[in-house]
Curated annotation (Swiss-Prot):
Enzyme class: hydrolase
Keywords associated with the record: GTP-binding, Hydrolase, Metal-binding, Nucleotide-binding, One-carbon metabolism, Zinc
Gene Ontology MF terms in the entry: GTP binding; GTP cyclohydrolase I activity; zinc ion binding
Pfam family for this entry, one: GTP_cyclohydroI
Any GO BP: one-carbon metabolic process
Catalytic activity: GTP + H2O = 7,8-dihydroneopterin 3'-triphosphate + formate + H(+)
Disulfide bonds: none
Residue span of region Disordered: 1-26
Species in which this protein is naturally found: Rhodopseudomonas palustris (strain BisB5)
Known partners and oligomeric status: Toroid-shaped homodecamer, composed of two pentamers of five dimers.
Recorded superkingdom: Bacteria
Name of the molecule in the record: GTP cyclohydrolase 1
Length: 229
């Protein structure tokens, strides 16, 4: 007699995959400033020399008039573009209001514009972040969510990692019932180099708590993002 294969609990087929759980991020990775004051770094002079070396590598004459100040300007631009390494996400989210006045639904801030740089080619990618969370006791000022996006965006990133870091930081500091983050962005490493396809958008999302566990809440989050009424 042929052996009978018993179905898994809940009627799932025998070859069903276990439910996926996203990897947890190490809080030390995103809750503190990435660069500490006592951390050894190259000097500004060394950084400017590195820029000069790259200019020479592509075939430029680094001594011509138009490039004399370029190394200094590039280093100053990097100081601005990557200032997120010196800023602490936890400090931004730690300034909260302790009273929700009985509010028990989620808070959504959408269309938070940002520009970041990919860690593969150090080329810009830019777009919008949409963030929702359902508070328990702590409510953060709405501008702080935009500030959080700015801090993480001003570091070398992948879009996937940026999405996960934003969600994890809110989840860890505010302890809400759930967090939803969606990012839509265009990557210049795809539009101006390589395949050279302009206008293509990449979407990433991350859900925690009630959003991860309840598809209806995910659908409502998506509906409110798309609504323009």
């Amino acid at each position: 007699m042929d052996a009978k294969i018993k179905p898994l609990r809940g009627g799932k087929p025998a070859d069903a995959r276990p439910e996926f759980q996203p990897a947890e991020l190490d809080p030390s990775e995103f809750l503190a400033a990435a660069v500490q004051p006592d951390q050894p770094r190259p000097s500004r002079t060394e950084a400017e020399q590195a820029v000069k070396t790259l200019l020479a590598y592509i075939g430029e004459n680094t001594g011509r008039e138009g490039l004399l100040d370029t190394p200094r300007r590039v280093v100053e631009a990097y100081d601005e573009l990557f200032q997120g390494y010196h800023q602490c996400p936890a400090e931004v989210l730690d300034r909260t209001f302790g009273e929700t006045a009985g509010y028990d639904d989620f808070v959504l801030v959408r269309d938070i514009g940002f520009t970041s740089h990919c860690e593969h080619h150090v080329m810009p990618f830019y777009g919008k972040a949409h963030i929702a969370y359902t508070p328990v006791e702590r409510v953060v000022g709405l501008s702080k969510l935009a500030r959080l996006v700015e801090i993480f965006a001003r570091r070398l990133q992948t879009q996937e990692h940026l999405t996960a870091q934003i969600a994890a930081a809110i989840d860890e500091v505010l302890k809400p019932r759930g967090v939803a983050v969606m990012i839509e962005a265009e990557h210049t490493c795809m539009s101006v180099r390589g395949i050279g396809k302009q206008g293509a958008s990449t979407f990433t999302s991350r859900y925690t708590g009630m959003f991860r566990d309840n598809p209806a809440e995910q659908a409502r989050f998506m509906s409110m993002i798309r609504s323009r009424g």
